[in-house]
Every structure is written in structure tokens, then in C-alpha cells.
């Protein structure tokens, strides 16, 4: 048996449902990284510092779920655009030659990255490439984000990065929540009216305009929208990413396809954000990788692992 010299894991509470070990270990196999191993550990907010202090230099990195994506901030240095801007990091990479920025000598220096945003972008790029679709580049397109929680913030950041999108409509049950969305869009999206935030009663009207749509509300919460999409005369022309990956496909994805649109599941976002994490933790890449860096063999193995 090969000795494990490099350890990584995903942290969260609960964490039993996580697919990250399946994805990361499949990537290690594809990349012939035989002495790398990835696991999962149930770690809550009060346990984070103690867990970090318990690690040894065989540890290379961590994946983090909410609320640890925010809790990790005092222990590390944000190193890519959206980790800095959003102050949310789902990826921690250790440097054992230095100590923690907060002065704790029992914790190594930690570089923090946000790969959620890039994962969303790459999921759309992959969908376009496999269907030979050339997206717009003139910021004339419209994106619709369903929900306005933490995932919606990452979705908005991904829309900012898409050269096709000039206007984002956020559809939410409580439009007044998440005051960070409007200033984020206004700061980064070079258009006269970068964002509108409306109630759920405007969902179908908004989705009819969507070149890109991203559902960020969890569980079965979007099933009502799915039923409304099936009404006579409703047609979709854009591409939907539903971040929910269980069940697959969701009712929203099924309805979207029935009404003429393209729908991709949340497992694609999960796959690509995990792939970028692997590159960062293993040192293959040290920033947000360009589209050309996507390893097709690695992608195929990860897709197979998720079946």
C-alpha cells in the first residue's frame, strides 16, 4: 500500500452527505497522485481552531462548507479575487514554512481561495462547449438568480465574470434581504442598470428573459416555480444551472428542458469547483485557472465517480 504523504479533507457539520471525497480522490487517481488522500471530518464552528491546531505537515489543504467558509477568515490570507471581495473561502491551502497570520504558532500559514464562483463559470462554459454554443460577448444578456442567500452571492459574482451578461434579475421570497448584492453588481458590472431585485411573484416573467438562470434555493423549494413553468405558452430559451444535485434531475430542470431551455445540474458546479480546489491544493495552479487548463481526462473521471 502506498504511504500517504499529502492529506486533504472537507470540513462541515453535518458532512456525511458530502461528495467531495469521491471527487477529489478520483482526481488524484486521474493525475497519478498516488500518495494523496482526501477525507471528510465533522467540524462545527466551535471546533475549527482546535482542528487546525491538531494538523501536522502532511496536511496540504481543506475544503470548507458554510459557516466555516466565513469562520476561516481570521486564520488565513485571501488570495484570489472573490475570496478577497466576498470574504468567503471554500478552500484553504497550507504553507508549513510560515505560521498563521493571527500569530498562533500551532497553525500553519493558510492561503484562502473561493472556487465556488469559478465552478459556476466553468459549468456554463462546459455546457456551451459541448453544445457548440457561442455566448454573447457584448454584455447584452440577462441572467436570473433564484434566491438571495450566500450561494446567490457567488452566483452573482459568476455572472459578473460572464462577458455575455449585462443585467441580473434576482428573484427572492424576501427581496429586502442580502443588502450586499446590489453594491456588488454596481461595483463590477459595467452597465447602466446592472441589477434588479424582485419578489417570487415575478419569477416566470423574469425567467422568460433569461439567457442564463441559476437556482440557488435548496431542496424542493423551487418545485413551485417548476410547476408554473409548465403553464401553456411559457417558453425558455436560456441555460439553467440548478445548484441542487439531489435529486437529479430536479423538477425545475425537467420543466426547463420541456419548455425549450438547456438545464445543467448542480453536480457540474460541484465537479468544477472541486477540480480547481485540487489544482490549488496540489500546487498545479496558484490562482483561478483559465478555461484552457481544464483536464478532460480528469473531468471524465470525476463525472464517472458521481454516477
Report the location of each language-model feature:
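Rossmann-like adenosine-cofactor binding region
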Residues: 190-264
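NAD(P)-binding Rossmann-fold cofactor-contacting core
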Residues: 164-189
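Phosphate/diphosphate ligand-binding glycine-rich loop within oxidoreductases
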Residues: 2-130, 247, 255
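Conserved S-adenosyl-L-methionine
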Residues: 161-167, 259-262
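Glycine-rich adenosine-cofactor-binding loop
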Residues: 12, 108, 114-117, 124-161, ...
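Adenosine-phosphate binding glycine-rich loop
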Residues: 129-132, 140, 239, 243-307
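Short, conserved loop/helix-junction motifs that constitute active-site signature segments
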Residues: 2-4, 136-139, 161-164, 228-238
